[in-house]
Amino acid sequence: MRIATYNVEWFDALFDRNANPLIDQKWSSRYNVTRADQWHAVGQVMRAIDADCILVVEAPNHKTGRSTVDMLERFADEFGLRAAQAALGFTNDTQQELAFLYHPHRCSIRHVPMSAPDFPRFDGTYAIDLDVDAVTDPINFSKPPFEAELVCHDGRRITLIGAHLKSKAPHGAKSKDEAMLISIANRRKQLAQALWIRGRVDQVLDEGAEEIVLGD
């Protein structure tokens, strides 16, 4: 079983508002790269990886009139990928989804969100004291991790957590001091998100299950 992860920068920009591929000589959202060149380059990489299961980070945006699953499966069909079926976790508002492509004759994947008293579902809110002031701070994911159950063709089950954590740039800062404060706050938030995932990992391992965390 070959499992991979691939962050496809601005994959969303390779499809129009009706989910049709944009394979032309206009510029992609990548610097100095046409949409056709990016489309074919990503396809060549995925064919070379030849994975049974691929976590696609920054998968095309899922919204009214556009299905992430349909767009990924159309892409997989275009390049004859073995990982030809797609599964989507929680959607988000960033235009960058987390999704899996998988080989249906080798495995199956389904979204199975988990929860625990101290570590809620990833689309919920995690309470933690970030700045050691004895006051809990609410933490959310802009891109909730994708918790999935991978079932191999031989019946083996593995829990997958696909994640995309970011420590955002200090947008809106008006001075170096303000930029420093915002950067520190963002780093603390990223650390809290990592602790949230770590808590889920421990929960799964304590149950005796196998687990893989992958992504950015």
Residue spans of the language-model regions?
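N-terminal, active-site-proximal structural segment of metallo-dependent hydrolase catalytic domains
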Residues: M1-L98, A173
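Active-site regions of metal-assisted phosphoester/phosphodiester hydrolases
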Residues: M1-V33, W39, G43, H103-G215
